Design a protein with these regions (language model features):
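A short glycine-rich, Lys/Arg-flanked "PGG" loop and its adjoining helix->strand segment in the class I
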Residues: 123-135
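A short SAM/SAH-binding and catalytic strip from SAM-dependent methyltransferases
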Residues: 108-122
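Conserved Class I S-adenosyl-L-methionine
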Residues: 24-27, 56-58, 185-252
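Conserved alpha-helix/loop element of class I SAM-dependent methyltransferases that forms part
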Residues: 26-46
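Class I SAM-dependent methyltransferase SAM/SAH-binding core
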Residues: 50-100
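Conserved catalytic/acceptor-binding region of the Class I
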Residues: 136-197, 211-220
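N-terminal, positively charged/glycine-rich alpha-helical extensions of SAM-dependent methyltransferases
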Residues: 1-18
Length: 252
């Protein structure tokens, strides 16, 4: 029951952010472009290519721009996010916590950008996705790791305020069911966002619908303390550091 309530809250927040998502999703755009740069060096077979947790179609559009012969099927559980995709694209409204739609199998390529940390059991789900690839097919995922948001966590420790951000996946857990020869590529990247203050930092998270967490909302006095003790740059602004992992998995 708790998971059901959580998933509904996640979906509602993404629905509410859908209209303005593209204006605020700089980190998602950055790693969508990076995924496309890797695709240029891979021999992707013919067949239906899938973007899982596609949101507004940011990654799918990037792939189609670079590879004009590819039409990417977009799967997401947020109806309003899917409605932001171009009309001509194939879209499937589906909760990925329930596996993949029955029609999805023998795919040459599956991608997922900033999605798996919202799923109930990402390790199992990723393995299921991998099993639906055709031989020689690729699964490419990008996701924030548990090492993200060190400034936030440090500030919460210093102020004795509960950390209210997401707990992101541990990379070794995500790939623990894969053999070394199935892990084609794995690399972590740091990405730093900068904001005038923590209030705008937290607003940026809301702007992309990513504010869902399992903690109580911070009180005003707690937010003030976080603003006061968050490490400052030379210009008195604040940074938020992400660690993003990109995994390319290949089915033999």
């Amino acid at each position: 029951m708790k998971n059901k309530i959580w998933n509904e809250t996640v979906k509602n927040n993404f629905n509410n952010a859908s209209a303005n998502y593209l204006s605020y999703s700089n980190i998602q755009k950055h790693f969508a472009e990076k995924i496309v740069s890797f695709l240029k060096d891979l021999n992707i077979q013919k067949g239906e290519c899938i973007d899982l947790g596609s949101g507004t179609g940011l990654l799918a559009d990037e792939i189609e721009r670079e590879f004009s012969t590819k039409n990417i099927t977009r799967i997401d559980f947020s109806k309003k996010m899917l409605l932001q995709n171009k009309d001509s694209s194939k879209k499937i409204l589906w909760d990925l916590n329930n596996g993949l739609p029955p029609s999805i199998r023998n795919c040459p390529l599956m991608t997922s950008n900033f999605c798996i940390h919202w799923l109930d059991n990402p390790e199992k789900i990723i393995r299921d996705w991998f099993n639906k690839l055709k031989s020689g097919g690729y699964l490419i995922i990008s996701y924030p790791t548990i090492n993200s948001f060190q400034e936030w966590k440090q500030t919460c420790q210093e102020t004795n305020i509960e950390y209210s951000g997401l707990t992101f996946p541990v990379t070794k857990d995500i790939v623990k069911s894969f053999n070394s020869d199935e892990i084609f590529f794995s690399k972590k990247y740091l990405y730093i966002e900068n904001f005038p203050d923590v209030y705008k930092l937290f607003r940026s998270i809301v702007n992309v619908g990513a504010q869902t967490n399992k903690c109580k909302r911070n009180k005003v006095c707690e937010l003030r303390a976080i603003q006061k003790f968050w490490p400052k740059t030379a210009t008195n602004s604040v940074n938020l550091t992400w660690e993003i992992n990109i995994e390319i998995l290949k089915k033999s």
